[in-house]
From Swiss-Prot:
The lineage of its organism: Viruses, Varidnaviria, Bamfordvirae, Preplasmiviricota, Tectiliviricetes. It holds the Pfam family V-set. SMART domains: IG. This is Uncharacterized protein ORF11. It comes from the Viruses. Disulfide bonds: none annotated.
Amino acid sequence: MLLLTVVLLVGVTLAADHPTLYAPKGGSIELGVGAKQKGQYKFEWRFGNLKIVIAEMSSTNQLEIKFPDNGFQNRSEFNPTKHNLTIHNASYEDSGTYSLHQEENDGTEHTDNFKVIVQGMSLYTYLQYALISPI
């Protein structure tokens, strides 16, 4: 019975949706799941179907990181320790769904989805303006 359970888990895709994130125009968008998980050898950050970062363990057990030439490469950072993605100088066009696809050695895949909305100003700035502006 245990063998059957293990066989059924191979190749399973798990997905998780995170709360919507709001970022100010011109600011930074920070996306991540927090901690590095063991057993994973391939990571892809995507914006829709566009790959932003591809990180994969090499045969020498080194993490190889690639930034495809697609407009994000000069303003994005990948944290190889926690697998987080930071996008700088956010624009309205950066609003949408970002996904972190992680693949483990046994073929199991995990996907974390993040919806991002880029706004004209931060909520903090808006509240400051609203509180000091005359009616």
